[in-house]
Swiss-Prot record:
One Gene Ontology biological process: ubiquinone biosynthetic process
Catalytic activity from the UniProt record: a 5-methoxy-2-methyl-3-(all-trans-polyprenyl)benzene-1,4-diol + AH2 + O2 = a 3-demethylubiquinol + A + H2O
Gene: coq7
Lineage top rank: taxon: Bacteria
Name the UniProt record assigns to this protein: 3-demethoxyubiquinol 3-hydroxylase
Chief location: membrane
Gene Ontology CC: one annotated term: plasma membrane
Cofactor note: Binds 2 iron ions per subunit.
Entry membrane topology: Peripheral membrane protein
Localization per record: Cell membrane
Organism: Ralstonia pickettii (strain 12J)
Length: 217
């Protein structure tokens, strides 16, 4: 357990501090490349102040979501009983690190900041992940599947409300959505069970609190 705790603690510090590095190219970079190849301007640089604030609020919410994803996966992996399940959770967490780095970069580009409450979000999510992990792999995987289903719905909403001209944010969110769908599918295929309705409803309520606060703070 101690052998896993040390690297997980390091990962936690990096997630909260916002110093993670992506292992994959940022999807937003393709927007710049496309604009350059066609000699067109990147419209994401022409956002009105209202659109900039709205896009930054949504990307801050997404950044918080990725901080929470790191914590959830780390808490679950720490108590996973099947080594194969632990490996699957670790691999998903590494992809979520990409999302975290992309969102952090986009917030900088929008001249905004991450949530001031990130340490609180991380601590709460880690505790939830650890409890899910202690309840057994099937429940833990079911929690992953339900979380990713709700995140997919949440990202769909962001794609509906992000400014059309903010092509960089939209590219990041679209790739995140594809990854989250795959993570949820993998969890179900690995044996994740459907969670009871009261738990799903509690998860949605907690998500609403987080997204409302993170949009502003």
């Amino acid at each position: 357990m101690l052998d896993r705790f040390i690297p997980e603690f390091d990962r936690a510090l990096r997630a909260v501090a916002g110093v993670t590095r992506a292992s994959r190219p940022n999807p937003a970079d393709a927007v710049i490349a496309s604009a350059a190849s066609t000699n067109t301007a990147d419209n994401a640089t022409k956002l009105s102040e209202a659109d900039r604030r709205h896009a930054a609020g949504l990307m801050r919410v997404n950044h918080v979501g990725e901080v929470c994803a790191q914590a959830l996966y780390q808490g679950q992996a720490l108590f996973a009983r099947d080594p194969a399940i632990r490996t699957q959770l670790d691999e998903a967490a590494r992809e979520e690190e990409d999302h975290l780095a992309w969102c952090a970069q986009r917030l900088q580009e929008l001249n905004d900041r991450p949530s001031l409450l990130n340490p609180l979000w991380y601590a709460g999510a880690f505790a939830i992940g650890a409890v899910a992990g202690r309840l057994g792999d099937k429940i833990s995987l079911g929690f992953v599947a339900e979380t990713e289903r709700q995140v997919e719905h949440h990202l769909d909403g962001h794609l509906d409300t992000l400014p059309e001209q903010d092509t960089r944010s939209r590219a990041i969110v679209a790739q995140m959505r594809d990854d989250e769908i795959r993570h949820g599918d993998n969890a179900r295929q690995a044996g994740g069970i459907d969670l009871p309705a009261p738990i799903r409803q509690a998860m949605r309520a907690a998500s609403r609190v987080m997204t409302t606060a993170a949009y502003r703070i």
